[in-house]
C-alpha cells in the first residue's frame, strides 16, 4: 500500500463514528430534554394544528444552526482547551469576558425562577387534585420545597449530581412511553377546528404571531448551549492536533446534527401526542392554570367518568410525579450553574478575581441565600410561566446562542470564512425574533 493510500485509510478510520461521538450525541440530547419540554406542547398546541406544523418545519433548523454557530465560536479560539469565556476574551478583550459572564448568569438565573414557580404549582396541583387534600398556603409550599432542595444540595451535592445524571434517561423514556400510550386517546378535535377558508394570519391569535411566540419556547426547550463549550473542548483535544480544526468542526457539526434530530423527534412527537389527546382549548386552560402539560394530563384523566383503563389510572398519578422529578432535575442543574455564575460575578467585581481574599464556603452560603430568596419571591408571586419564558428566559438564551456567535463571525478574523452565509441570516433572525418578544409582551 502506498503512503497516500495509508494516509487516506487512516483518515477514513479516524473520521468514522466513535463511541465518544455517541456519548456526546446523547449528552447534548439529554441536556436539552428537561422541564422546559413540559411547556412546549402548551405553547405549540395553543394555536391549533397549522402553527404546530409550521413549528415542526422550523424545529430542526433552529436546534441545529443555532448550536452549530455557538460551537463554531467556541472552536475559533487559539487554545484547544480554552472554554467560551477565554475565547470571547481572546476576540474582544476583558470587556468581552465580562459580557459573557453576565450573559451566562442572566441566562440561567431566570430559568431557576421559572422552575421555582413550576415545582410549586406542580406540587400544589398534585396535592389538591390527585391526593384530594385541602389547599395549602402558597408561600409555605414554595418555602418548604426550596428549603428541601437547599438541604439536599448543601449536604449531598456530589451524590445528587450522580442521581440527576441517571434520571435523564428514565425521564426521556417516560416521555416516549407516555407519547405512545396516549395514542388510543387521540381525537380529531384539533383537526376539526381547522378552517382553511377563515385562516387568520395576523392579530393576537393569528398564525404568524403564534409561531413567533412559539419560536421563543423552541429556543428555550431545544437548548443545550450550557454544555456546548465543554463538548467543543473535548472534541478539539480528541481530534484537532492530528486532523486539524476543519475536521474537528465537521465532526462537531455532525454530532450536533444527530443530537438535534433526536431531540426534535422526541419533543415534537410528545407535543403532537398531547395535542391530539387534548385540544387547543385544553392547552389554553393549561396556560391559564400555569402548570406543565403532564400535570394537566393528570388532571384530565382524573376527571374522566366511567371505568378508567389501567393506563389512565397510572397516568393520573404518575404524570405529576414524572413532572416533579423532571423539574427537580432541571432545578438542581440550573442551581449549580447559577451559583457558579453569581460567585464568578462577585469574585470578578468584588475581589478582582482573587479567590484568596474570600472564603468560598461563606460566599457559597451568601449566594445560596440570595438565589433561594429571589426564587421564593418569584414562586410566591406566581407569574405566568410561559410569559416568563418568552419575556426573560428565551431572549437571554437567544442573545448567547444566536446573536453573540453572529457578532463574532462579523468581527473576529478567525471566523471570517463563515461570513456571508444564508444560515447566518436565519440564526440572526431567530435571535432577533426571540428578543423582540419582550417588546410584544410590553405592548
From Swiss-Prot:
What Pfam families does the database record attribute to this sequence? Trp_Tyr_perm
What exactly does this protein do? Involved in the import of threonine and serine into the cell, with the concomitant import of a proton (symport system).
Protein name according to UniProt: Threonine/serine transporter TdcC
A GO cellular component term found in this entry reads: plasma membrane
Q: A GO molecular function for this record?
A: threonine efflux transmembrane transporter activity
- What membrane topology does the UniProt entry give? Multi-pass membrane protein
Transmembrane spans? 22-42, 44-64, 97-117, 140-160, 163-183, 207-227, 259-279, 319-339, 366-386, 389-409, 423-443
UniProt xrefs under InterPro entries? Amino_acid_transport_2, Hydroxy_aa_transpt, Thr/Ser_transpt_TdcC
Provide the gene name from the record.
tdcC
